[in-house]
Amino acid sequence: MAKRDYYEVLGVERGSSEADLKKAYRRLAMKHHPDRNPDSKESEEMFKEANEAYECLSDPNKRAAYDQYGHAGVDPSMGGGGAGFGGQNFSDIFGDVFSDFFGGGRGGQRGGAQRGSDLRYTLELNLEEAVRGTSVNIRVPTLVNCKPCDGSGAKKGSSPITCPTCGGIGQVRMQQGFFSVQQTCPRCHGQGKIISDPCDSCHGEGRVEEYKTLSVKVPAGVDTGDRIRLSGEGEAGTQGGPTGDLYVVINVREHSIFQRDGKHLFCEVPISFVDAALGGELEIPTLDGRVKLKIPEGTQTGKQFRIRGKGVAPVRGGGAGDLMCRVAVETPVNLGRRQRELLEEFRSSLEGDDSHSPKTTGFFDGVKRFFGDL
């Protein structure tokens, strides 16, 4: 069967950056890794295919040869004149790719103890909780060590045995033409041990699914995107490996009155056109209660007033921000007869005196000049 194009295997374009290649490979490797699909031959083949594609495209020289000559440029068995793979160690190439997921680099890929995966939990808060801080109980699905077998995967009274194929390393070296490649042991799937008499509770996995209830203390001043790390509250490791961490990611819901931008809060304050014209005093809501705000006469829509110290104190320290109040002058509706008469009288009183509406006068003067110049 003809080999698939390496770029097609990874699902990227030919001009993709190294970061894009690595991201695509990590996604495929996590999906098809033998440890996660122990009984799937298809996943094993796709994992190997992704390994081969990334091994080639992550090396600038091999990638250049592949781009020019295709598979013949990098595979000596196809008779091409390319650089080939030169006997480079498989685990040296991919150690950094798996370091975040399989226990910290190359050592984590071999048989033996492996660190548990980190978990992510999105915590929804309202604005008041985010600003003031709170304590929340959350329920998180995770993997914990199986109690009957104490995480070994073997039935009580028995023990896992060292894999005879890889000698407990979890990796086997495969000779391919002029070079050799290390691959996950197909018999123990990288664990280094074989369980001949599996535990009835976990079926040899060593871990079982469970919901944990945890108390999360949220500090005051957090914002959307902030993370709280709970060490050791992720998935249990395998074969005695350390437990991963839980990352609680904050998401602050929209507020009906306030919008937040960093440490500052913003709100829109509707006022009547009478208050805007004559001035007055308004009660403005803040997260700490109501405050008085003086509105000077002649206030226009869009005018912004600053109330100092009524914003948010940042979680990383520093003084509280401000509350910015933007005025929106409201046009009266549903007028009664007498109200209309009064407004008509008011309009008549303004005729011939442009000093009361300088912006309006300036605008229409500009319009006249514009059409006069045409």
From Swiss-Prot:
Residues 5-70 form the J domain. The keyword Zinc-finger applies. It comes from Pseudomonas fluorescens (strain SBW25). Zn(2+) 2 binds at C163, C166, C185, C188. InterPro entries: DnaJ, DnaJ_C, DnaJ_domain, DnaJ_domain_CS, HSP40/DnaJ_pept-bd, HSP_DnaJ_Cys-rich_dom, HSP_DnaJ_Cys-rich_dom_sf, J_dom_sf. This is Chaperone protein DnaJ. The J domain is necessary and sufficient to stimulate DnaK ATPase activity. Zinc center 1 plays an important role in the autonomous, DnaK-independent chaperone activity of DnaJ. Zinc center 2 is essential for interaction with DnaK and for DnaJ activity. The keyword Repeat applies. A zinc finger (CR-type) spans 133-211. Pfam families: DnaJ (PF00226), DnaJ_C (PF01556), DnaJ_CXXCXGXG (PF00684). It is found in: Cytoplasm. CXXCXGXG motif repeats lie at residues 146-153, 163-170, 185-192, 199-206.
